[in-house]
Amino acid sequence: METAKKIAKFVTDFSYKDIDEKVKDEIINRIIDAVANAKYSYKDLKIFLDPLLENLKGNAITLSGKKASVDYASFYNSFLIRYLDFNDTYLSKEPLHPSDMIGGILALASELKSSGKDVIEAIATGYEVGITLCDAGSLRKRGIDHVVFLGVGAAAAASKLLKLNEEKTANAISLALVPHIALRETRSGSLSMWKGGAAAESVRNAVFVALLAKSGITGPELPFTGKMGLINVIFDGKGFDETALERMNGSGVLRTLIKEFPAEYHAQAAIEAALDIKLKKEVKNVTIDTYEAAKTILADDASKWKPQTRETADHSLPFLVSVALLTQNFWFESYNFIHDKKVLELTSKVEVNEVEEYTKMYPSSLPVKITVKYSDNTQESAYREVPKGHYKKPMNREEIITKAKRLGLDDRVIDYINNIENKEALTVVF
């Protein structure tokens, strides 16, 4: 059976009654975390996003409370959520930030006047589809960006919210996939604002094509398995594990990860480890031993040793570790050190190595060892296998609320989301 049809069958068969309480709790945690990220981002992004509202009018309500067309509201919300690179993560053959899709789900829900239960159901559905595709195959190793899988997951979520039948859901998935194969260049070398915008566009596309499918527009019948479909063109007919789809059960959110620090997820454990080391003498060199994905994503070229933008810095393992070592802290103000002489000097002494044993431990563990060697040839090390926020060491609701408040989310919004299951005609505004 065509993969899109397998996904569509899961989407239409899955329902709210299949969601257990732990999954509901974690979905609420993800909504709080995502909306808090959006709140903090708004002050930086409003000058880019708000002027477009005049020409893209509609009845969907954005997280800022302004109205827009539902597709632009989806882009708007998702850009705000993704911009900080501080929302959740999933790590497998392909990484994903599944809560990116929450921006589109909330935008569509505001227009449809969906209930809180409808939203929880849609998020559980979208997460399951998106992360299952990440289990099936790696896009990044083939030069394609992970937002391709995000778009399929978001289309599944939008289809669920729109209550589409199996045939129309399959069309929405096809329309989300075939025209929207995004290049990994978004995340290569020196990074731009599109690091956040790529996810937002993918979610916008997903909501838009779900509406097209609802109206009866059809997509290619074999978007995954056709002669010119994803599996044959991108995966060369191999390297995509169809059996992953057999494991879909709606609990995938439990395997996603929340960030403690505002940096790319592969750096979370490294920052924690760096904070364990108190520099005492002149540093001769710093060695970071880690797994393949962390090295490939966070130390792939010279720009990561001398980042010029915030977008590159939060994907730079040498910079992130150096700042944490020198300041014994890591928060948004840490990015003010991009051009700091002491940080640049220490960064130049950093070496990043892939350790085969660590690569074999990934993705169930994210091992990193940092060793600081001093000029007198003494040294000290710190090791982490997983950071706080990993599903093996999860952040609880209280810790997530503390993070949300630090990002500027107030009690009114937090209380509203905490009680989302009982809401009718849901609208979330920060």
Where are these regions (language model features)?
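Well-ordered alpha-helical segments within folded domains of soluble proteins
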Residues: 99-106, 150-157, 203-208, 267-271, ...
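A generic short alpha-helical patch detector that favors 3-5-residue windows
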Residues: 2-3, 96, 118, 146
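Residue-level detector of well-ordered alpha-helical segments, enriched
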Residues: 23, 27-31, 100, 118, ...
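Well-ordered alpha-helical scaffold segments within catalytic/enzyme domains
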Residues: 38-41, 105-112, 155-162, 209-213, ...
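Terminal-appendage/accessory-domain detector
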Residues: 1-94, 191-204, 211-430
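General structural signal for alpha-helix termini and helix-helix connectors
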Residues: 13-17, 110, 136-139
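Hydrophobic alpha-helical hairpins/lids featuring a short glycine-rich hinge
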Residues: 81-133
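Glycine-rich, mobile lid/loop segments that gate access to catalytic sites or pores
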Residues: 113, 117-204, 208, 220-227
